[in-house]
Design a protein with these regions (language model features):
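Core beta-strand residues in small-molecule sensory/regulatory alpha/beta domains
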Residues: 75, 141-146
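N-terminal signal peptide c-region/cleavage motif recognized by signal peptidases
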Residues: 13-20
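Exposed beta-strand-loop-beta-strand "reactive/processing" segments of non-cytosolic proteins
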Residues: 53-96
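Short alpha-helix capping/helix-loop boundary micro-motifs
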Residues: 147-153
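SH3/SH3-like beta-barrel superfamily modules
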Residues: 157-193
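Bacterial N-terminal signal peptides that target proteins for export
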Residues: 1-7
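Short, non-transmembrane alpha-helical segments in secretory-pathway proteins
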Residues: 21-59, 127-131, 147
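C-terminal partner/receptor-binding element of secreted or periplasmic proteins
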Residues: 101-129, 190-205
Length: 205
C-alpha cells in the first residue's frame, strides 16, 4: 500500500491543463460535494447556531481561476419577505489546492477553515469529469497488498458510502486511491464487487 501524507492527491494525478476544461455545468453537476465541504467545516456560525449540516448549501456566486466564491445558507424555504433568512457566510474555496476560507467580514483578511478532506478530491474529480466510485454493501471494505486479494492490509479499510478513484483493474480486483478525512491518501487493492460507479446527477440537493 502507498500512503501520501498531507499532499492533495489531485496534484499527483492531473496535469495543470486539466483545470481549464471545467465548465459552469460541471460546477452545477458537482454542487453536492461543495455543499459537503462547507457543511463539514469549522465555520464559527455553523457551530454556534447548531445548524443541521444536511441543509447547508453553497450557492456559487463567482469563479476566478481556481477560486470559487459562494454564498452559504441553510434555509431552503426562503421567501420574498425574508430574503436573507438562513444566510450563514460567504466562503472562498480553491478547488485545486483544497483551501477553504471564510470571507464574510474581511475578504482581504479571510479566516482559514478546516473541513473534511474526503470530499475535496471527490469534488475535484467530479469537476474534471473523472469517474467516481462509491463503496457499497454494509461492511467495511478491506484493503489488500496484492491483486489476488490474498494478503489484507492490517487495520486499513474504507467504510460503506465512501468515495474512491480507480486507477486500474486486474481480474476481480481494483487498485484505488482513497483520501481520508485528515487528508492522507491511501492506495491499494480492493474487491471490485464492493465499488460501483456513482453519478452526481442521481442526487437531488
Amino acid at each position: 500500500m502507498i500512503i501520501f501524507k498531507a499532499l492533495p492527491f489531485v496534484l499527483l494525478t492531473y496535469s495543470i491543463s486539466a483545470f481549464s476544461s471545467v465548465t459552469d455545468d460541471d460546477f452545477d453537476r458537482c454542487s453536492q460535494f461543495l455543499n459537503k465541504i462547507v457543511a463539514s467545516s469549522n465555520a464559527n456560525l455553523i457551530k454556534e447556531l447548531k445548524v443541521d449540516r444536511g441543509l447547508i448549501k453553497a450557492d456559487v456566486d463567482s469563479i476566478s481561476s481556481n477560486d470559487i466564491t459562494a454564498k452559504v445558507q441553510f434555509n431552503k424555504m426562503q421567501s420574498t419577505d425574508t430574503p436573507g433568512e438562513g444566510f450563514l457566510l460567504w466562503m472562498k474555496y480553491d478547488y485545486v489546492n483544497f483551501n477553504l476560507e471564510d470571507v464574510t467580514i474581511d475578504p482581504d483578511n479571510p479566516e482559514q477553515l478546516k473541513f473534511d478532506n474526503r470530499y475535496a478530491s471527490v469534488y475535484f474529480s467530479c469537476l474534471n469529469k473523472k469517474v467516481i466510485y462509491k463503496v457499497n454493501g454494509d461492511s467495511r471494505l478491506q484493503f489488500y497488498k496484492d491483486d489476488k486479494l490474498s494478503t489484507p492490509e492490517t487495520g486499513v479499510f474504507i467504510l460503506p458510502g465512501e468515495y474512491v478513484e480507480v486507477e486500474r483493474k486486474s481480474g476481480s480486483a481494483s487498485y484505488v486511491k482513497y483520501q481520508a478525512k485528515n487528508g492522507v491518501v491511501y492506495s491499494s487493492w480492493v474487491d471490485s464487487s464492493r465499488i460501483q460507479k456513482f453519478s452526481p446527477e442521481a442526487i437531488k440537493n
